[in-house]
Amino acid sequence: NYTQPDGTLGGFREEVKSLTAGLGADVIYDPVGGDVFDESMRCINWGGRILTIGFTSGRWPLAPVNLILIKQISVIGVRAGEYGRQDPVKGKENTDEIYRLAEEGLISPYVSHAFPIERSVEAMRLLENREVIGKAVVTMNGYEFDKESI
């Protein structure tokens, strides 16, 4: 979470550049939009791809065409459900591949919070206040969620 106390985004671009030896990311998966998209445009590698998944920030980003041209990057809209409806065969192949990667432990969601259902109001409050990074899990029937097990 790179949100600063004043609500602005800071450090995201610098962290990506640091992790990539100054080159920038080859692919950025952006479900947030807004400031994250703006920063992503500035830390994407030459020829990279930004996958726009959604706008949970509440602000639709505007893509600066000059950066797209200069860096020769691609900004790609990704709607998994629609992709599967338009091309069911390819959609199933993609879904099967995601399941395979998850089963092999190569991808897993980051879960920052887990709550029993009795505390679901607290979970919703954290989501509303943007205090959750990744996912928040609500469990039922006394199930103990182990964040390390996924």
Model feature map: region roles:
Residues 35-106, 139-150:
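Glycine-rich phosphate-binding loop and adjacent beta-alpha segment
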Residues 129-134:
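Glycine/proline-rich active-site loop of Rossmann-fold NAD(P)-dependent oxidoreductases
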Residues 24-25, 107, 120:
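Local beta-strand N-terminus motif with an aromatic residue
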Residues 115-116, 136-141:
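Short-chain dehydrogenase/reductase
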Residues 1-36, 90-93:
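Adenosine-nucleotide cofactor-binding segment
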Residues 61, 113-116:
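A structural signal for short, well-ordered beta-strand elements
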